[in-house]
Amino acid sequence: MLYQQISQNKQRTVVLLVVFFALLALIGASAGYLLLDNYAMGLVLALVIGVIYATSMIFQSTSLVMSMNSAREVTEKEAPGFFHIVEDMAMVAQIPMPRVFIIEDPSLNAFATGSSPQNAAVAATTGLLEVMNREELEGVIGHEISHIRNYDIRISTIAVALASAVTVISSIGGRMLWYGGGSRRQRDDGDDDVLRIITLLLSLLSLLLAPLVASLIQLAISRQREYLADASSVELTRNPQGMIKALEKLQLSQPMKHPVDDASAALYINEPRKKRSFSSLFSTHPPIEERIERLKNM
């Protein structure tokens, strides 16, 4: 059951990424048709913008991410218990030892960052280190090490970059069409070709809806990687109860004291900000009760 869950989560992520690239191609083709009367040109430009966004975000400095989250690097001497758990989990996962950081915050949380295992880092709040026992900490750190081993940070970064690219292209396309697309519309207004009119309407609709769809896909990818990291943590520790108990404590945690931006929030094991009441479709994290239920069903 464990390996089946891991396999299913990986497959769902692949499907979502394929849909994401298809959406980017669609929005590019739509913008190209409306503004340049050239599907191919718009499609190519959209993919180029997507690749540039993703590349620039993937190579964002690990130290910069830690600085944005008020994390300070610690040595083995400063935090031996935490350091050794990270070291043990990294050894089991067969990845290089990541850098270790602590965030001075009473809430219970942790996250990992880095585009590859070679430049990764793990951070935990002081609240997490004080409240959780070793079994629970192993579950949490196993979760974060799994993110590193599974290249989740890179995948999530690509998803954020693609969502940003879709939004930018849609916004630019909409503004150019509004301010300078009169000739395109006038020509179509007198055209009896029903197919051309339908194509125009569908292109306009895609420009309007693409940013929302892109955000939903990006959030769905984030949730799938959380499920995968939970299951992968159990694979590393061989102890589902440790992860379950950790999640039960995380469920009772208060929001973090320092502000957390949207990009950083998706990295944490638990939503670091105040819980929102709307649908989980718009959340970076799946409900903790669902995560616990999946672990119990392994």
Swiss-Prot record:
Zn(2+) binds at H143, H147, E226. Its cofactor is Zn(2+). The active site is at E144. Binds 1 zinc ion per subunit. Pfam families: Peptidase_M48. It is a multi-pass membrane protein. GO terms for cellular component: plasma membrane. Its main location: membrane. Keywords: Cell membrane, Hydrolase, Membrane, Metal-binding, Metalloprotease, Protease, Transmembrane, Transmembrane helix, Zinc. The chain crosses the membrane at residues 14-34, 39-59, 158-178, 197-217. InterPro entries: HtpX_protease, Pept_M48_protease_HtpX, Peptidase_M48. It is found in: Cell membrane. The keyword Manganese does not apply. The keyword Transmembrane helix applies. CDD domains: M48B_Htpx_like. One of its GO terms (molecular function) is metalloendopeptidase activity. One of its GO terms (biological process) is proteolysis. Its EC number is 3.4.24.-. It is an enzyme of class 3 (hydrolase). NCBIfam families: PRK04897.1. Belongs to the peptidase M48B family. HAMAP family: Pept_M48_protease_HtpX. This is Protease HtpX homolog. It comes from Streptococcus pyogenes serotype M3 (strain ATCC BAA-595 / MGAS315). The lineage of its organism: Bacteria, Bacillati, Bacillota, Bacilli, Lactobacillales.
